Amino acid sequence: MQVIRLAVTPPKDPMLPPDPTMIRDAEILSQLTDTIARFVRERLVPAEQHVAETDTIPDDIVADMKAMGLFGLSIPEQYGGLGLTMEEEVLVAFELGRTSPAFRSLMGTNNGIGAQGILIDGTEEQKQKYVPALATGEVIGAFCLTEPDVGSDSGAVKTRAQRDGDHYILNGTKRYITNGPHAGLFTVMARTDPEIQGGGGVTAFIVEGDTPGISRGKADVKMGQKGAHTCDIIFDNCRVPAENIIGGKEGVGFKTAMKVLDRGRLHISAICVGVATRLIEDAVNFAAERKQFGKPIIEHQLIQAMLADSRAEMFAGRSMVLEAARSKDRGEKVSLDASCCKLFCSEMVGRVADRAVQIHGGAG
């Protein structure tokens, strides 16, 4: 399946018309979203059971994802990506969300948290050196913020980075690192100034995956999302060149991380909307075929009410995400709105999934 490598813009969304100021070429983005929707339908959905059973995405599918440019959706064209705006990215994510999250997880870090720190705050030299390989999928990126004792209190990073000449020596453990087992490039948040409490003493580093002193823990065993891998990343006297500080400046890594997470929250919110859309479609199709009491169960009012509630919540989430994405594209601060989107959409898709299971009854 061939990638469409042109400047792209949103088509007329069937549920909420896009902001005209964000449109660059609606026809080309329509081609891109149609191509991805077909790829999801014809290649990814049929492979879902295999991925769930083997915890592995087939190599031929990964190759197709690379050929289509999916690893560089949000990476600017000058670094080999498609250069989608935030609104365009969430429109694509709506389609990618209609299949197992494992597929999106593999390439999601390259588009998001694995590359955005470099793109947002990195030097031009850093961008030229590292981003093109992320855009093609040649290298998988990962984002190292969470630690065994550092979760929601993300400014309390304990991993240390001590200056040693023209290098820094990193020591510490990062936990639940998405794509950690496969990553060839890490964005690492480490404390360079232990005297400063909170995020002010944290610096962002670019660390290559084959750097001596890096080891990877055993892949986490999860109840769901088979095929999407996480693990601990351990730094033991890992020497990183000082030139690999993102942007060349100490003490601003926490700010970089927060900027990265704004985009990531909107992307994940859009994926939740896509998952909810798939759940509703599957529930409608099942309810139309399943008969009880002499008629399809979709004709029973209780089933209709559950579908209506799910559809209304999905629409609300979709509208929220698109509005926040447009605000980000206009250069507005969206930290609060992006967090609201992720909170609502992640809880919304849980409720939709619960109703879908109920509609399927014993088959759920």
Task: Tell where the protein language model's regions lie, with residue ranges.
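Alpha-helical interface subdomain recognition
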Residues: 1-109, 121-126, 133-138, 153, ...
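Glycine-rich phosphate/pyrophosphate-binding beta-alpha loops
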Residues: 150, 175-181, 263-267
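A short core secondary-structure module
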Residues: 167, 171-216
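Flexible, glycine-rich active-site loops centered on histidine and acidic residues
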Residues: 115-121, 143
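A short, Trp-centered hydrophobic/proline-enriched beta-strand micro-motif
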Residues: 137-145, 189
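Flexible, small-/acidic-enriched active-site or ligand-binding loops
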Residues: 156, 212-239
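Short glycine/proline-enriched turns and hinge-like loops at secondary-structure junctions
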Residues: 84-85, 153-155, 179-184, 198-201, ...
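A structural signal for short hydrophobic beta-strand segments in well-ordered beta-sheet cores
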Residues: 159-161
